[in-house]
Amino acid sequence: MWVKLQAVSLSSILSHLIISISLVGVAPRCYDTGNFTTNSTYGRNRDLLLDSLPRNASANGGFITATIGQGSDKVYALAMCKGDSTPEKCFSLVNDTIHELMDTCPNQKEAYSWTGDFSVVHYADHSFFGTLELEPSVAVYNTGNVTSNLTEFDTVWESLINSVVRKASNGSSSLKYATGEAELGAFQRIYSLVQCTPDLSEQRCDSCLRQSASRYESCCHGKQGGVVQRPNCYFRWEMYPFYTANASTTASLSPPPSPSSPPPPAASPPPNSVDSEIRKGKYRSARCMLISGIK
Ligand SMILES: *[C@@H]1O[C@H](CO)[C@@H](O)[C@H](O)[C@H]1NC(C)=O
Ligand SMILES: *[C@@H]1O[C@H](CO)[C@@H](O)[C@H](O)[C@H]1NC(C)=O
Ligand SMILES: *[C@@H]1O[C@H](CO)[C@@H](O)[C@H](O)[C@H]1NC(C)=O
Ligand SMILES: *[C@@H]1O[C@H](CO)[C@@H](O)[C@H](O)[C@H]1NC(C)=O
Ligand SMILES: *[C@@H]1O[C@H](CO)[C@@H](O)[C@H](O)[C@H]1NC(C)=O
Ligand SMILES: *[C@@H]1O[C@H](CO)[C@@H](O)[C@H](O)[C@H]1NC(C)=O
Ligand SMILES: *[C@@H]1O[C@H](CO)[C@@H](O)[C@H](O)[C@H]1NC(C)=O
Ligand SMILES: *[C@@H]1O[C@H](CO)[C@@H](O)[C@H](O)[C@H]1NC(C)=O
């Protein structure tokens, strides 16, 4: 009886989530700041540099900046993987992202792309390392509603987001990434993952993530999950675990007011289903979805 109930509710949660985080097919973005011609030195440099990124990013802990060439043929590139990616996963995510990018932006001097579960690749004919770029950005939400008292939810959520943002911003020049979870009443938990490209300063990382959190709040407050993606930072929260936690990147929280809580229910939808939906870019546009333009 219990098992059956469990199975029913699990699959209904699951299908709900798959519909709900059905987001955005916006990536990749080709910038309209100039084109190169086929077989040009810039084009060859771009292809060489992009080809090196999957291996270099995965060998380097999930983040790499690199350049190739001289003068007007110089290409700058950045690649980053989600902080809990294995080197193998990082390689294949960056490889996929680059192939999509090259298919979509065959001759653009600058382009940017991300995949949902997630990796970021950006290249340009000028240096953008350490520069905070807030656009293009995408904000999407899980269509389920928060069912608990929103006032109490907000307090827990804000404190969790504050903790993960502080922890990630205070990371190193090779990793600015944090996850965290907080108890919401006796039976629910909130999970969050935030990450900046670690070429950003602490202050710029903090700013990128806080602007992403407020963007979520202004578009989608009351929804039970959301993602905000920008060229330099990634923000996501859900009411189920969707990352692999690691003590060294877990933000510590002040203990909740009522400490006598039983463990959270075990039934959580497998994050892969949602993540692969995000990754495949099968996102549906939603009322609150915000996509803003490119410079
Ligand atoms: C670059 O090429 C694209 C087509 O591939 C074209 O739409 C765009 O206008 C070009 N941009 C510039 C700045 O020439
Ligand atoms: C680019 O180079 C290839 C191989 O060298 C050649 O076959 C092709 O015609 C060239 N394309 C252009 C537009 O010059
Ligand atoms: C990246 O890869 C290239 C060639 O694959 C290699 O020569 C270079 O040293 C690598 N750079 C870094 C920073 O790992
Ligand atoms: C890289 O991605 C492309 C297209 O997604 C795929 O065809 C290719 O096999 C991948 N390469 C590796 C080494 O995984
Ligand atoms: C969430 O709440 C909104 C407005 O309160 C309602 O229109 C919507 O149907 C709810 N969504 C779900 C999945 O319950
Ligand atoms: C929600 O919680 C706040 C603070 O605990 C309380 O003041 C408020 O009455 C609650 N609202 C509802 C609708 O239960
Ligand atoms: C930032 O991290 C360092 C260790 O890397 C730690 O000593 C310091 O207390 C942290 N600062 C904040 C504000 O968390
Ligand atoms: C946790 O993070 C540390 C430091 O980044 C790393 O050395 C370790 O391999 C990670 N552990 C797991 C299980 O991923």
Name every feature range the model reports, one short phrase each:
Residues 2-295:
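Extracellular secretory-pathway ectodomains and N-terminal mature segments of eukaryotic proteins
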